Amino acid sequence: MAAIKEESDYDSSRSSLTAPDSRRSWISDIGSSSSVSARSFGGDTPASSCRYKPHKANQAEWEAIRRLRAGAGRVGLEHFRLVRRLGSGDLGNVYLCRLREPWSSSSMTTTAGGCLYAMKVVDKDALAFRKKLRRAEVERDILRTLDHPFLPTLYADFEASHYACLVMEFCPGGDLHVARQRQPGRRFTVSSTRFYVAETVLALEYLHMMGVVYRDLKPENVLVRGDGHIMLSDFDLSLKCDVVPKLLRPARSAAAGGKPPLPPPSSCVPPTIQPVLSCIFRGVHKCHHAKECAGGGAAAGNNGDGDGNDEEAETETAEPEVVVVEPVAARSKSFVGTHEYLAPEVISGQGHGSAVDWWTLGVFMYEMLYGRTPFKGESNEKTLINIIKQPVTFPRLAGAAAAGEWEEMKTAQDLMLQLLAKNPKKRLGSTMGSAEVKRHPFFKGVNWALVRSVRPPEVPAPPAPAPKKVMTMSKKERQEPYNYRPENHFDYF
């Protein structure tokens, strides 16, 4: 992932590296200033901030953590048994883990051996040296605020020596990049793509309402839960901004060439995450627009002195007003993301906002349908040049017409073209956010309120029971867990 110095992104370095176990090069240097202490990560999340969350209140994982915190007074690394490493990234490693006895036993637990969790472990001293500690803090602060079916649940966060640990839910289905490799032709069908893209849109919509610009959407970061629904992951590249609720009328003038009013500018703020969205909008009144007539005529001759019939007709035909609570005017100049997913405005350094998430949604959708990204070149430099200069092209898929996908594919291509508009001001979603994207014909028939009730294209098999063999880590392995590749099962201490 890539980033350049930008004050609102808390960056003070420029570094380039390739993350392990990644098929794409990453560039990233959103770090922390040298004044940020490696000990500023904080201890275990207080019980008050680990409240029951509406979407996860009945989970066995929540109940087990609640009982642990009530009995032990805190949650720490000593309460967990690490099973195996799930993956690694720029900041640290993620381990599959479960609670130790007696905390693992629960009447709500259905998994053999207790509830499974994913624990992200980062070395604070190493991140402070690389000036990237702030990124880890941003991710933690964002995770603490999230409560959405398609976003991670943070069960606990704590420190162990110079390590910071985030305990989140485990997704046994892997990620969509791996899932795509299993599909015929290594691509998803249009119907499967619609399902995953729709859930991703809802996740982005919620993030934007919370003032979070994700900036790292790609199949590798879209995980599959045990029920087959998705979960976005990795928020260390996200940008936190203010959002101001706005009531806007969709551009009925889309055909007439007009534009709806823009919301007031958003301001980027340090990630002391405080949700600014209120359920009660005060002082917001509907705007009654005068009817616009092209070329004069009888309506123009009225001069607004009619008997009100025109106003009633306008009310009947006008698009309903939409509440827009998204950082559509947020601006950042950080160079952050994965090469193949970078938006043109990020590459050019002109400054970017939440529209970059809709660009990456277009690239994400393209890769799901065609098995590759639209602008990939022979090198990273060529890829960036293609993003800036080359138009979007769509390869012909053998068997698409026979499978009855041709018309659906044309609608999907239209959506991708609008999402991949190089001018962010003309990009779908740049003005009214997710409301514009959800209205596209590609999503015709999608009941957005009941997406969670739709059967996913694939439901992963239950995770296999953990092996009985237990390995004890050496002192060196305890001190450097990020360099240790466990084979089966081990005790951390």
From Swiss-Prot:
Gly residues compositional bias, start-end: 295-306
Limits of the Protein kinase domain: 80-443
Annotated InterPro entries: Kinase-like_dom_sf, Prot_kinase_dom, Ser/Thr_kinase_AS
Ranges of biased composition (kind: Low complexity): 27-44
Protein name: Protein kinase PINOID 2
Family the entry assigns: Belongs to the protein kinase superfamily. Ser/Thr protein kinase family.
Keyword Iron tagged: no
Keyword Kinase in record: yes
Organism expressing this protein natively: Oryza sativa subsp. japonica (Rice)
Residue ranges occupied by any AGC-kinase C-terminal domain in the UniProt entry: 444-493
SUPFAM superfamilies attached to this UniProt entry: Protein kinase-like (PK-like)
Biased composition annotated in UniProt, kind: Acidic residues: 307-319
Region (Disordered): 1-53, 295-320, 458-493
GO molecular function, one term: protein serine/threonine kinase activity
Binding site for ATP: L86, G87, S88, G89, D90, L91, G92, N93, V94, K120
Catalytic activity: L-seryl-[protein] + ATP = O-phospho-L-seryl-[protein] + ADP + H(+); L-threonyl-[protein] + ATP = O-phospho-L-threonyl-[protein] + ADP + H(+)
Function: Serine/threonine-protein kinase involved in the regulation of auxin signaling.
SMART domains: S_TKc
Active site as annotated: D216
Signal peptide location: none
Gene Ontology CC terms: cytoplasm; nucleus; plasma membrane
Keywords noted in UniProt: ATP-binding, Auxin signaling pathway, Developmental protein, Kinase, Nucleotide-binding, Serine/threonine-protein kinase, Transferase
